[in-house]
A protein has these predicted regions:
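Solvent-exposed helix/loop surface patches that form functional interfaces
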Residues: 113-168, 239-241
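An acidic-aromatic
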Residues: 70-140
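A mature extracytoplasmic/lumenal domain signature
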Residues: 54-56, 80-82, 95, 104, ...
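Short, hydrophobic/aromatic-rich segments at coil-to-beta transitions
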Residues: 44-51, 70-77, 166-174, 205-209
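Gly/Pro-enriched, hydrophobic low-complexity segments
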Residues: 168-241
Length: 242
């Protein structure tokens, strides 16, 4: 059955801390090519280690874990601040479902093998949840083929600055509105005035993504860590996409 489409309006705004505020300009051919392959490189790698900082008026959440871009599944530890500490525990998600495993003493990293029991499952919400929107966005940051480099500048992609992320020199680029499907589609070239911001290395490696979600005034920040990626094992009852 075809997956129902869901659109998240992602808006990159504000200033980039630690970055060079260079004048906005159209992407060069090399820059467009790097932006075009960045999602494909995530898929080609199999997966990436990620840290997702989710905004919330109650305090916010941080998810630390891994995303398997070929299987379409993420897994990690979720920790909250302020009133959001009640969300602490393990989390696993696909494009269709979110599973949480509450823990009073949450480990720094998720165990390689998910617990056999104690999971609470719910559908991934299409709107109204900054966490669920963030999880869906992360899954969409991998693609089994490059994007069209020629269309990116035509649709408004631009270079907005330079920065350093954990010692890596990066270019900060914007892309138009990003459309995430109920699968793993995430198209930087979608035609819209809204933008998402990417921190891209000289070889096309994606180091950071920042995007707004409709339910919060602050953006979600997705950092692709230098930690080693470990393949994600599905929790009981979870069927990976791959």
């Amino acid at each position: 059955m075809a997956a129902a489409a869901t659109t998240f309006f992602l808006i990159g705004g504000g200033t980039d801390s630690g970055g060079d505020s260079a004048a906005r300009r159209t992407l060069t051919s090399d820059e467009a090519n790097r932006l075009a392959i960045t999602r494909f490189l995530n898929y080609q790698a199999g997966g990436r280690a990620v840290t997702i900082t989710v905004p919330s008026a109650a305090g916010g959440l941080v998810v630390t874990g891994s995303v398997d871009y070929r299987a379409g599944i993420g897994y990690g530890v979720v920790r909250g601040a302020g009133r959001d500490t009640s969300s602490d525990g393990l989390i696993q998600w696909t494009a269709a479902a979110v599973l949480v495993h509450p823990m009073t003493d949450t480990p720094a990293t998720a165990p390689p093998a998910p617990p056999a029991s104690g999971w609470y499952r719910r559908p991934l919400q299409k709107s109204g949840s900054a966490l669920d929107s963030s999880l869906a966005i992360v899954l969409g940051l991998g693609s089994d083929r490059p994007d069209n480099a020629e269309l990116l500048p035509q649709n408004g992609a631009a270079l907005v600055g330079k920065d350093r992320v954990r010692g890596h020199s990066v270019d900060v680029m914007t892309g138009p509105n990003v459309r995430a499907n109920d699968g793993t589609s995430f198209a930087p070239g979608s035609n819209s005035s809204s933008t998402v911001r990417y921190w891209i290395g000289g070889d096309g490696t994606m180091y950071r993504v920042r995007a707004g979600v409709a339910s919060e005034s602050q953006p979600v920040v997705i950092d692709f860590d230098d930690r080693k990626y470990f393949p994600v094992r599905a929790a009981p009852g979870v069927t990976p996409a791959g």
